[in-house]
Amino acid sequence: MIMSLGPYASFIVTSYAAAALVVAILIGWIATDYRSQTRRLRDLDRSGITRRSGRSAMDRP
């Protein structure tokens, strides 16, 4: 199944390639940020800092 894109083929292909590149960059950015946040949380847990959301209602003043 071969489609003829007409005289705008280069524009269409370039647009799809640019969109794919942007999506790939965003996925990479999110993956890098996730690893960074996970590492920071692990370091905080190791240092003894606890999360406020982990406390029960009875622990609050």
Curated annotation (Swiss-Prot):
Record has Ribonucleoprotein as a keyword: no
Function, as annotated: Required for the export of heme to the periplasm for the biogenesis of c-type cytochromes.
Protein name in UniProt: Heme exporter protein D
UniProt organism field: Bradyrhizobium diazoefficiens (strain JCM 10833 / BCRC 13528 / IAM 13628 / NBRC 14792 / USDA 110)
Protein family according to the UniProt entry: Belongs to the CcmD/CycX/HelD family.
Bridged cysteine pairs (disulfide): none
Any one Pfam family match given in the protein's UniProt record, by short name: CcmD
InterPro entries to which the protein is assigned, alphabetical: Haem_export_protD_CcmD
Annotated GO biological process: cytochrome complex assembly; heme transport
Domain of life, source organism: Bacteria
Gene: cycX
The entry's keywords: Cell inner membrane, Cell membrane, Cytochrome c-type biogenesis, Membrane, Transmembrane, Transmembrane helix, Transport
Subcellular location: Cell inner membrane
GO cellular component: plasma membrane
Membrane-spanning intervals of the chain: 11-31
Record membrane topology: Single-pass membrane protein
